[in-house]
Amino acid sequence: MGSKLCMKRLMRDRQRYDELDSEGLGIYCHFSDENMMNVKAMVIGPEETPYEGGFYFFDINFSNQYPLVPPKVNFCTLNSNVRFNPNLYKCGKVCLSILGTWSGPGWTTTMNLITILIDLQSLMNDNPIQNEPGYEKRYWKKDEIAASYRTLVSYYNLCVAQFQMMDMTPPGFECFKEVMERRFLKNEIFYKRWRDFMMPLEGQHFTNRYAGMGTIIHSNHWSSMIDDRLEQLRFKYPLCEDKQQDTLELGGAKEDVNPEKDTEEPDTKTVSEVKPNTRKSPKEQAKLYEIGFTKAGEDGKLWVVKGYKSGMRRWVRPKS
């Protein structure tokens, strides 16, 4: 059991998480009633990056000195063939300045669990190799190396961070299994993009300093695996698939098989649980605007730029 200050802050962290839009941000936590000093977290790879839709697990352990010192964080989406990020080691080490394991601004007592998870998600950007210090000066063919690394991360993001994590979920993270499967089922737009990118690379050999001895791309195999898994999950979660399909076909030439339902009030709870993986916030990146700037999103609703301690900016819905 931690100190009084530690327990108070952990309870506040849990409250912050309960107020968080987990599905929208792609950040999930499991708090153990038996051990409040440990939190299991799953961060979903951001859209339009090589990490998109991946399930990235973190084991977070707090000490009695929290929040005076940061917790210890271990990366648990592991595979011997690839290092997913210069800041995420194959051994599970996480290099982040606020954790005291990387150069840069350190931990402050105003930071919390959500701060850490958002910072971890920010590592999963479109060009992850640039996270390595001195990258611009160190590599001669830096553009070629960056492209090769993005390709490998994207490949293993599907093979390892999605399929392997669903089939061989690390101990302690089984609590996220249903969320993983439902998100996989709703991510068909991503799989189309993945196929468009990977299929022309079938049989090609990629090497990179973060990818061991190199990798041969087997996109045909994984493409069929996607189809098989989607079919299994449609059978397992028929409601999720039916609602998603209805939503994807809105505005198209689909014939309404039950027009009487047009007059019924929608079940907002059900719709929110099965919403497709489409953008609702403004299409422009939040980092282009000042904190507090408001703008109508793709959903027609008002969004505001929120700033975080890490320097990251995101579109969020203003609190009513």
Model-derived features: where do they sit?
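Strand-helix-loop interaction patch of compact alpha/beta domains
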Residues: 1-100, 104-111, 115
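Generic recognition of well-structured, leucine-rich alpha-helical segments
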Residues: 11-24, 36, 65, 69, ...
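Short, charged low-complexity linear motifs
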Residues: 37-47, 177, 288-295
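Short amphipathic C-terminal alpha-helix that caps PH/PH-like domains
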Residues: 113-124
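Charge-rich (especially acidic), low-complexity segments
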Residues: 130-260
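Arg/Lys-rich, low-complexity, intrinsically disordered basic segments
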Residues: 259-320
